[in-house]
A protein has these predicted regions:
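Catalytic His-Asp segment of secreted/periplasmic serine-dependent ester chemistry enzymes
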Residues: 1-110
Length: 110
């Protein structure tokens, strides 16, 4: 996650996203634009609060990371659940016939 000096989330996957949309159009495949939707979520959280979604651990907070962890790439459980919720909601929007098969579990707040 990268924010600019004004606190706006940066788009860091432009070329990849463009390629995804190109293939989507070429083969008529629906796309869940998780790049944009995750940026929207991060922007709503803001620079400091968005850290709650990532592997940001203080020293001795987790036995696997005794020195702590400052990872702004990989989601923690809460962040992964938020991303999964976005995907599931978009599946419902793109493929309504699948909606009855999707169960949205509440996000754990720890």
């Amino acid at each position: 996650m990268k924010f600019d000096k004004q606190g706006n989330i940066q788009e860091t996957h432009k070329e990849y996203s463009a390629a995804v949309w190109e293939v989507s159009k070429q083969y008529n495949i629906p796309v869940i634009d998780l790049d944009k939707m995750s940026r929207d979520l991060l922007q709503k959280f803001g620079k400091e609060n968005s850290k709650l979604l990532f592997m940001q651990l203080d020293s001795l907070q987790h036995p696997n990371y005794p020195a702590g962890q400052k990872d702004n790439t990989h989601f923690n459980e809460y962040g992964a659940r938020r991303m999964a919720q976005i995907v599931l909601m978009e599946i419902k929007n793109l493929k309504p016939e699948l909606a009855e098969r999707i169960i949205i579990a509440p996000v754990k707040k720890s």
